[in-house]
Curated annotation (Swiss-Prot):
<feature type="transmembrane region" description="Helical">
    <location>
        <begin position="255"/>
        <end position="275"/>
    </location>
</feature>
<keyword id="KW-0157">Chromophore</keyword>
<feature type="binding site">
    <location>
        <position position="367"/>
    </location>
    <ligand>
        <name>[CaMn4O5] cluster</name>
    </ligand>
</feature>
<dbReference type="GO" id="GO:0009523">
    <property type="term" value="C:photosystem II"/>
</dbReference>
<keyword id="KW-0150">Chloroplast</keyword>
<dbReference type="Pfam" id="PF00421">
    <property type="entry name" value="PSII"/>
</dbReference>
<comment type="function">
    <text>One of the components of the core complex of photosystem II (PSII). It binds chlorophyll and helps catalyze the primary light-induced photochemical processes of PSII. PSII is a light-driven water:plastoquinone oxidoreductase, using light energy to abstract electrons from H(2)O, generating O(2) and a proton gradient subsequently used for ATP formation.</text>
</comment>
<keyword id="KW-0007">Acetylation</keyword>
<dbReference type="GO" id="GO:0016168">
    <property type="term" value="F:chlorophyll binding"/>
</dbReference>
<keyword id="KW-0472">Membrane</keyword>
<keyword id="KW-0464">Manganese</keyword>
<feature type="transmembrane region" description="Helical">
    <location>
        <begin position="178"/>
        <end position="200"/>
    </location>
</feature>
<comment type="similarity">
    <text>Belongs to the PsbB/PsbC family. PsbC subfamily.</text>
</comment>
<keyword id="KW-0148">Chlorophyll</keyword>
<feature type="transmembrane region" description="Helical">
    <location>
        <begin position="69"/>
        <end position="93"/>
    </location>
</feature>
<keyword id="KW-0597">Phosphoprotein</keyword>
<feature type="transmembrane region" description="Helical">
    <location>
        <begin position="291"/>
        <end position="312"/>
    </location>
</feature>
Length: 473
């Protein structure tokens, strides 16, 4: 058997137990990678790697379209979205499609169109993927030099980085244009319980936008996750889109500086590790955003946040007992603190009881009842509207807690079955995926650094310890 590693090889070698397996000429002997190492076999075949990536994009878009149509087919307009296990329709609704005042779905046709467009796109991508994987040129450098590359070519790599940044910037501006010119987006803070509106008065002040980045991530500060009005969100996308596009142009026009050439590892596996690290960070940020933020992820579609459901429970029983004659301003609870209302250490009037720990919740159904010093007793006695009562009762019974087949021991409706909040699903999945991507980053970064340093050459199969051990059978 040939020695499956060589000192010349820039990439570490993975091997399969059966060295005879060949796939369309891309076998283990010629590439040093077994079939299960997937795209590693294509490291130096830019045409085939393009096919793999386009086919992968096709699978992603197909999943989006198919799942979109599945959710449309199962959607019941009379029930809230968050009761129906939906994760795609809430995103479309947040963009202002198909919904009216209060987040009520008035037209499902835009959702159907979205699904069909994604399916058609996936067919085009799928064809392109199969073409480039099976029929197209193995390498692009000769026929299409613009699309060809060598992994060690630092200038070409930063050009590719620049193109990616420009595409990301265009994506950010698509949201801006939707909010400004194409019907607007759903604003959970619109008076009377939320509505679709065009965002006209963008926040473009750098001190406000970048102030979010300088906030503490803890408690009442909440870093960028604390954003609570759409003007700031859309204005932030203007800044982000501009920075991405300008940065992309800069990376296309310039070559890496000497310090960057020295500090970074310039190989395919290194770029993979950088990408995995970035996606990991995105996953963790998305987890926090969907869990805590009810502006970017309106509760009408995703269900209440944890603090929101807790405060809604306190509010619901305050309303009930006030109707029954309780003096909610002075009633004492079992600890001697206020039963319904109390003061925070800094003097604001907040809800009493266990929900005191969520005193800094902001929610559209609650804010109208606040005064300059927290909750306003006179407003709580005179100004509570029916829609606020309905919404808080609904949120109280739909806390984002989570076991798969129960409702976690909080106040529930008599017929609440198998409710799991989309917030729970989205936050948990993004946390877990963010963690896995981080582990992938560590793995590939370690291999890339070892390969660059020249000391990872795979295992010498002639003297591998397992060869001298008794077979399992």
């Amino acid at each position: 058997m040939k020695t499956l590693y060589s000192l010349r090889r820039f990439y570490p070698v993975e091997t399969l137990f059966n060295g005879t397996l060949a796939l369309a000429g891309r076998d283990q002997e010629t590439t040093g990678f077994a079939w299960w190492a997937g795209n590693a076999r294509l490291i130096n075949l830019s045409g085939k790697l393009l096919g793999a990536h386009v086919a992968h994009a096709g699978l992603i878009v197909f999943l989006a379209g198919a799942m979109n149509l599945f959710e449309v087919a199962h959607f019941v307009p009379e029930k809230p979205m968050y009761e129906q296990g939906l994760i795609l329709l809430p995103h479309l609704a947040t963009l202002g499609w198909g919904v009216g005042p209060g987040g009520e779905v008035i037209d499902t046709f835009p959702y159907f169109v979205s699904g069909v467009l994604h399916l058609i796109s996936s067919a085009v991508l799928g064809f392109g993927g199969i073409y480039h994987a099976l029929l197209g040129p193995e390498t692009l450098e000769e026929s299409f030099p613009f699309f060809g590359y060598v992994w060690k070519d630092r200038n070409k790599m930063t050009t590719i980085l620049g193109i990616h940044l420009i595409l990301l910037g265009i994506g950010a501006f698509l949201l801006v244009f939707k909010a400004l010119y194409f019907g607007g987006v759903y604003d959970t803070w619109a008076p009377g319980g939320g509505d679709v509106r065009k965002i006209t008065n963008l926040t473009l002040s750098p001190s406000i936008i970048f102030g979010y980045l300088l906030k503490s991530p803890f408690g009442g500060e909440g870093w960028i996750v604390s954003v609570d009005d759409l003007e700031d969100i859309i204005g932030g996308h203007v800044w982000l889109g501009s920075i991405c596009i300008l940065g992309g142009i800069w990376h296309i026009l310039t070559k890496p500086f000497a310090w960057a050439r020295r500090a970074l590892v310039w190989s395919g596996e290194a770029y993979l590790s950088y990408s995995l690290a970035a996606i990991s960070v995105f996953g963790f940020i998305a987890c926090c955003f969907v869990w805590f933020n009810n502006t970017a992820y309106p509760s009408e579609f995703y269900g209440p946040t944890g603090p929101e459901a807790s405060q809604a429970q306190a509010f619901t029983f305050l309303v009930r007992d006030q109707r029954l004659g309780a003096n909610v301003g002075s009633a004492q609870g079992p600890t001697g603190l206020g039963k319904y209302l109390m003061r925070s250490p800094t003097g604001e009037v907040i809800f009493g009881g266990e929900t005191m720990r969520f005193w800094d919740l902001r929610a559209p159904w609650l804010e109208p009842l606040r005064g300059p010093n927290g909750l306003d007793l006179s407003r709580l006695k005179k100004d509570i509207q029916p829609w606020q009562e309905r919404r808080s009762a609904e949120y109280m019974t739909h806390a984002p807690l989570g076991s798969l087949n129960s409702v976690g021991g909080v106040a529930t409706e008599i017929n609440a079955v198998n409710y799991v909040s989309p917030r729970s699903w989205l936050a948990t999945s993004h946390f877990v995926l963010g963690f896995f991507f981080f582990v992938g980053h560590l793995w590939h970064a370690g291999r890339a650094r070892a390969a660059a340093a020249g000391f990872e050459k795979g295992i010498d199969r002639d003297f591998e310890p397992v060869l001298s051990m008794t077979p399992l059978n």
